[in-house]
């Protein structure tokens, strides 16, 4: 099974609409063929319209950083998955460690969001990963397997084949500790084996798994050489056009 690599920038709470347009103008003629590498930017909700307009006709896919699990209602401050689809959004990040940590999102919330995203014809990027405390207790596999089982509950094999899972070791973010490419591969392999156990081998071979711990131009080739790593969920290194281009064109 040949999986198309997917490099996704997660801008977090950075960039305004003007900066967004400037960024896309700088990269859109230099992106790889989407059959080789899928290039994706996930932007703050306030930038999505500018991002979509600037990227029109290019190889850049558009993603949101979050959404709610209801299409409409009295949910002040939330983002509707139905409206995201109407805007032309392709992917939505859910379950990011910052959402779980700062905003107390639960596995149940993330599962509901995954179902809402599929119901509206988009694809979720489901994040998972363990803390330093969990890693030092050697419980990382149990932790991540439990997250995956909860996130995928009730999804069909066809749906799981089309989504993206992003492994982000929380212990390697801002701690001075670094996950080696072998550690990243070990966990991505565990995730794939979990999907196989829950569904079947074909589904496990289809699902794309990203690594999301300080991916940058200097380490992207080594990470992408690993058999179970199909892409990167990139934070800071995706904010600069030249850096983002170096990441998505890592095969050159």
From Swiss-Prot:
The keyword Cytoplasm applies. It comes from the Bacteria. GO terms for molecular function: triose-phosphate isomerase activity. GO terms for biological process: gluconeogenesis; glyceraldehyde-3-phosphate biosynthetic process; glycerol catabolic process; glycolytic process. The active site is at residues 96, 168. PROSITE patterns: TIM_1, TIM_2. Its main location: cytoplasm. Homodimer. Involved in the gluconeogenesis. Catalyzes stereospecifically the conversion of dihydroxyacetone phosphate (DHAP) to D-glyceraldehyde-3-phosphate (G3P). This is Triosephosphate isomerase. It comes from Lactobacillus acidophilus (strain ATCC 700396 / NCK56 / N2 / NCFM). The lineage of its organism: Bacteria, Bacillati, Bacillota, Bacilli, Lactobacillales.
